[in-house]
Amino acid sequence: MSKKKQKNRSLPGTGSIITSAVFLALVFGFSLAGIASPDRKFSEMENRSLQQAPKVSFEGIKNGSFTEEIESYMSDQIFLKDELVTMKTGADTVLGKRFMNGVYLADDDFYIQDFQENSQQIKTNIDCLNEFAKGLDNNIEVDMLLAPNASCVLYDKLPAPNQCGDQHKTAEDIRAMLDPKIHLAYPEEALRTEAEECYYHTDHHWTSQGAELGYSALRQIMELPAIQKYERSVRELDNFYGTLYSKAPRTGAQSDTIDLVTYEGNAITVRYPVAAGDHEIPAECTEVNGIPQKEGLFVKAPESTKDKYAALMGGNFALTEIETNADSNEHVLILKDSYANAVLPELCAQFSHISLIDLRYYHMQEESVSEYVKSHGINRVIYIYNIDFLNTDNNFVWLE
């Protein structure tokens, strides 16, 4: 009798067989679906091009690049990848997890990017900004708009406990490092007065409201009058889910609205002399003397995609040049990150000649930045950077 019971215990139960069968069916089903479905070329969720099937070559096998490409291909082309990632985020949230892929799921449906100070990188970058400023002619004004991130202004919305760094302290360290020639505008206090309106719920950028408060602080240190010549109007882009959402997508996340700000009556022409950047030259452009140019700051194509923030200027480019009918005839050079794009409506209402250089893509094109200053008669330089960018970017070495 005991032998019979022992024998029965060694046999798999019906439940185990069903579980195994379902698991195998899912594995083979997803594999077959992945094989049958066409490869995706672009992920709107991740806002990037996806790895395509690599070509087999002896050289690729020898140097290991083929193995790396095939691994990327298999990862990028997982069947229903976006839906599976969303399901995982939902499951992690149910289990009480509030920090995923460098992003905090904060109060009031805010996604807030983590911040950990890299003091050495900040010092390197500030040294580059200082040396560039000191190398300019004495009659060239140098101003800086330093934008705090949501982890600073919305710190009280972070889950407790958390390991997020103190950006306020970092900002004070930056202030102490800056050369006296650089006039600093740091709008943390002003942003706190309208904190929830100054940052997107799902993206790492500040909103048009935040950018306007930032510009107000910058305008005051430049001792310039408020904009009075033009009437401000706003067009809304709804259903925006930004880059932080893509890192931890979840069902029911609150979407954002992007405000496209226009100062009515301000005629703006934008030129794209250098094509390098994170997007293609806008389709609205026509070539004038061999240089693509368009009217107005906004680009139509991104408005119908997930990448709606790129509606501002069409993205970030090595060099763009803007002409407006503002009263000031100063020739202004703005060294920038993507936070600066949201400030452009105000800048264009203040200055008639603006050049924008993004050091991530401007790598000594035809002339160095210093040479550009001289050849284009620049008489004011403005740095516009957010703290996290200064903390992580390593392209300031191109500032010569």
Predicted regions and their residues:
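Extracellular glycan-modifying ectodomains
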Residues: 1-400
